[in-house]
Regions:
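Solvent-exposed edge beta-strands and adjacent loop segments
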Residues: 6-81, 124-137
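Short, acidic/charged, Gly/Pro-enriched secondary-structure junctions
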Residues: 95-119
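Short, conserved charged micro-motifs
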Residues: 91-100, 156-158
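A general structural signal for short secondary-structure junctions and capping/turn motifs
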Residues: 74, 98-100, 109, 135-139
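Oligomerization/assembly interface segments of phage tail-like spikes and tubes
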Residues: 71-92, 139-153
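Mixed-charge, glycine-accented linear interaction segment located at domain edges/termini
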Residues: 123-171
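N-terminal export/ancillary region detector
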Residues: 1-2
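Short, hydrophobic/proline-enriched secondary-structure or compact coil segments at domain edges
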Residues: 20-27, 82-84, 103-112
Length: 171
């Protein structure tokens, strides 16, 4: 059983919602070294050799985590859900998203506050791809990509050295 250790003071309204980028990479065992005390990713596994970067814009890119502890079973499950909107449908993207949907790729989202947050670090994410042409001329044309993972802790934030290592292998 976990005992609380800290209070939290009132926070100033200085943050922004949403994500500005998602980094995807093929599943590997233990992609990050994560501190047990701070839940911060402090190192990148050397097996991560290629990371694919997708820029996000506009509202509608979200990351939500919902952790549920069950006192009866003694378990806790954190559902991580990233919903990403990528404008404009293309042949190349269609082929790549077919691969993504059949993968267990890991994801790191970059928030509008400059934080990098890792998703699906134990088993990767399950991916759903929805392509939409829209109906009216001003409707969204592109992909809604949803990644879902279940972990036993909240998603770890990456420290600066780990961010540097991750960005060094973006192709």
């Amino acid at each position: 059983m976990g005992d609380l250790t800290k209070s939290r003071s009132r926070q100033c309204p200085e943050t922004l919602g949403g994500e500005s980028k998602v980094l995807l990479f093929n599943r590997v065992d233990d992609p990050f070294t994560v501190s047990a005390t701070t839940n911060e990713a402090t190192a990148l596994n050397a097996a991560v050799t290629a990371v694919y970067s997708y820029d996000l814009s506009g509202d509608g890119n979200t990351l939500e985590e919902s952790m549920v502890g069950d006192i009866v079973t003694g378990t806790r499950v954190n559902s991580q859900t990233a919903v990403l909107t990528l404008k404009k449908m293309t042949v190349a993207d269609s082929a790549e998203f077919n691969l993504l949907a059949s993968s267990c790729a890991h994801a790191v989202v970059l928030t509008r506050n400059g934080d990098y947050i890792a998703l699906g670090i134990t088993e990767g994410c399950n991916w759903t791809i929805v392509s939409s042409t829209g109906a009216a001329k001003a409707d969204f044309n592109g992909y809604t990509v949803t990644g879902v993972a279940q972990e036993n802790k909240l998603a770890p934030y990456l420290d600066s050295a780990t961010v540097t290592a991750l960005l060094a292998v973006v192709v």
